[in-house]
Amino acid sequence: MPTINQLIRQPRVSARVKSKSPALENSPQKRGVCTRVYTTTPKKPNSALRKVAKVRLTNGFEVISYIGGEGHNLQEHSVVLLRGGRVKDLPGVRYHMVRGALDTQGVKDRKQARSKYGTKRAKAGKK
């Protein structure tokens, strides 16, 4: 236990909080260009083909980003918008694509949670 004089000379230093999405550099989103679009398999016990893309950001970082929703139109050289948010069963994937922004289209025929997938509201059908 330090004395009060020791604390006056050298105060306690609080631990620095480490960012979970360092490539965003404290921005809410960042723009980037897809360098590779591919599928990968999740960790045990899950099984799927998850759609991901390697993206070079405007600040020079190269990160792996998850493409949410059913179906996508992305290919190499597509310009995309990234947000933070990891995918628990994909190691190294710490970013999500923002659907419906820049070159990324929204999810087709989406009815619920549309804002998360960049889908416009459908026209009211006949009853």
From Swiss-Prot:
Modified residue annotations for 3-methylthioaspartic acid: D89
PROSITE patterns reported in the protein's UniProt record: RIBOSOMAL_S12
Positions with biased composition (Basic residues): 113-127
Name listed for the protein in its UniProt record: Small ribosomal subunit protein uS12
Keywords from the UniProt entry: Methylation, Ribonucleoprotein, Ribosomal protein, RNA-binding, rRNA-binding, tRNA-binding
A Pfam family this chain is assigned to: Ribosom_S12_S23
GO molecular function: rRNA binding; structural constituent of ribosome; tRNA binding
UniProt record, GO biological process: translation
HAMAP family reported for this sequence: Ribosomal_uS12_B (MF_00403_B)
GO CC annotation terms, alphabetical: small ribosomal subunit
SUPFAM superfamilies: Nucleic acid-binding proteins (SSF50249)
Disulfide bonds: none
Role played: With S4 and S5 plays an important role in translational accuracy.
Highest taxon above the source species: Bacteria
Family designation: Belongs to the universal ribosomal protein uS12 family.
InterPro entries in the cross-refs: NA-bd_OB-fold, Ribosomal_uS12, Ribosomal_uS12_bac
